[in-house]
């Protein structure tokens, strides 16, 4: 998930802080999702996809979402 999440966020020209604010989580938590320290809940994973406007499911391949 890490590389794809960073790639899609940067294409949308969003910072980690902006993502965290839109998801109503801390920047530390969001950064943890990107670097693989934390795994998002299914609810947060779906919200990440929504915020990024990402339609494909493969943004979360090879991760422990849920």
Predicted segments with their positions:
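Residues in the helix-turn-helix
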Residues: 18, 29, 58
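DNA major-groove recognition helix of helix-turn-helix
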Residues: 34, 44, 52
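Short, basic-rich loop-to-helix N-cap that marks the start of a DNA-contacting helix
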Residues: 37-47
